[in-house]
Regions:
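Short, low-complexity disordered leader/linker segments with a strong preference
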Residues: 1-12
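Hydrophobic residues in beta-strands and at strand termini
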Residues: 20, 82-84, 89, 160, ...
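N-terminal lobe/hinge region of extracytoplasmic solute-binding protein
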Residues: 19-75
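Short, well-ordered beta-strand elements
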Residues: 13-23, 78-81, 107, 166-168
């Protein structure tokens, strides 16, 4: 039998086992703090709108939860992504037994979490460099007023235009943005 093969292992059971020299720091993206091991695991369980096709030459981006590559404005500052309907989260008690579909607002919330001072994310710099309008101000307000981060406050930098459409507005042109 090949190394790692379990005798009597059934095809229905799908388990991925990875060995790391240290435990992961978190499964929560804003709290991984650039932990390579945690990020390796997260890449297996979270899906971004786009993913790399590493086998293509040259390497290219392909839609993952998006239906296509984003529409990019002429000035290179606005990216509009349409999500594929019918993608559901894995069952979780948080969903109270109901199926939960992935929607654009989920990505808005996920990005905003990096700005929430409660998480003190060391990966925030990756978003700060994009200068997403409104997000730094929202963070600053939460810090200055010592109040919880306002997830309900709409900002120009990241918005759900409808159930399946996500718009990201950069504060300055960045041709590498979709490759990050």
């Amino acid at each position: 039998h090949p190394v790692g093969h379990q005798v009597g292992h059934t095809a229905e059971r799908k388990v991925l086992r990875l060995a790391f020299p240290t435990p992961e720091s978190s499964f929560d993206p804003p709290q991984t703090n650039s932990d390579a091991y945690a990020n390796t695991l997260l890449a297996q369980i979270l899906e971004a709108p786009l993913a790399y096709d590493y086998l293509a030459r040259p390497v290219r981006l392909v839609p993952q939860t998006a239906v296509a590559l984003p529409e990019v404005s002429a000035d290179g500052m606005t990216f509009t992504l349409r999500l594929r309907p019918g993608i559901y989260f894995a069952d979780d008690p948080a969903f109270k037994g109901r199926q939960r579909e992935l929607v654009a607002q989920d990505y808005v919330y996920a990005i905003k979490r990096f700005y929430d001072p409660r998480y003190n994310s060391s990966d925030l710099y990756q978003f700060e460099g994009l200068k997403l309008p409104g997000l730094s101000e929202l963070r600053r307000r939460a810090l200055e007023q010592r109040k919880p981060f306002d997830y309900d406050q709409e900002v120009q930098g990241v918005r759900a235009l409808d159930r399946y459409t996500l718009r990201i507005q950069l504060g300055q042109s960045d041709p590498r943005f979709i490759w990050r």
